[in-house]
Amino acid sequence: MFSFLKKPTPEELVKKWKRELRREDRGLDTQLRAIDMQEKKTVRMIKERVKAGDQKSAKTLAKEIVNSRKAKERIYTAKAQMNSVSMQLQSNLAMTKVQGNLAKSTEIMKMMNDLIKLPELNKVMMAMGSEMTKAGIMEEMISDVFDMQGEDLEEEAEMEVNKIMDEILVSGPQVSSAPLETHQQEEVVQEKQEDSELLDRLKALKS
């Protein structure tokens, strides 16, 4: 009776948090796959725009790739931090046998404050951080959210755009070391020729 009022044990709390971290990690994997799929579509669209002589639209699309790659970097960093939080929690739990309760951890607090800034994780990390604060692991969290849309493309970013344009148009398909069928060889040659023509068009547009 009244078992629902019972305070969760450190083991129960850590198990719950690690389960939530794994769930969020899977969600980030789904986002990464979606970004990769969209990036492939954008690359095809850039080639089409360059072929049509529309460099302005091509560069606008290239900016989307710059932003998507930055988003992927943030997601990979978040995944690594969540894994570190999970390991720190497990280590902290092992210490409860000596201390009797979950100890305060500046490492966990720092990583949680970083994770909470990502819009994708803000809500879940806020709730988890509140529970960790009550459990004595950390102090109050900073609730600032990182605005991914507020990044301006300055000169450095413009260089990134040009780099991506060159990367897309210069790099041909990767050829396997295994022998290719005749029709496959023809397709590879044709794609390289098309990319070379697109690069010439781009240079002409820039001049």
Curated annotation (Swiss-Prot):
Gene3D superfamilies: 6.10.140.1230. It is found in: Endosome membrane. Its main location: membrane. Keywords: Coiled coil, Endosome, Membrane, Protein transport, Transport. It is a peripheral membrane protein. InterPro entries: Snf7_fam. Pfam families: Snf7. The keyword Transport applies. Residues 183-207 have a biased composition (Basic and acidic residues). Residues 174-207 are annotated as: Disordered. Residues 183-207 form a coiled coil. GO terms for cellular component: ESCRT III complex; multivesicular body. GO terms for biological process: endosome transport via multivesicular body sorting pathway; late endosome to vacuole transport; protein transport. Probable core component of the endosomal sorting required for transport complex III (ESCRT-III) which is involved in multivesicular bodies (MVBs) formation and sorting of endosomal cargo proteins into MVBs. MVBs contain intraluminal vesicles (ILVs) that are generated by invagination and scission from the limiting membrane of the endosome and are delivered to lysosomes enabling degradation of membrane proteins. Probable core component of the endosomal sorting required for transport complex III (ESCRT-III). Belongs to the SNF7 family. This is Charged multivesicular body protein 3. The gene is chmp3.
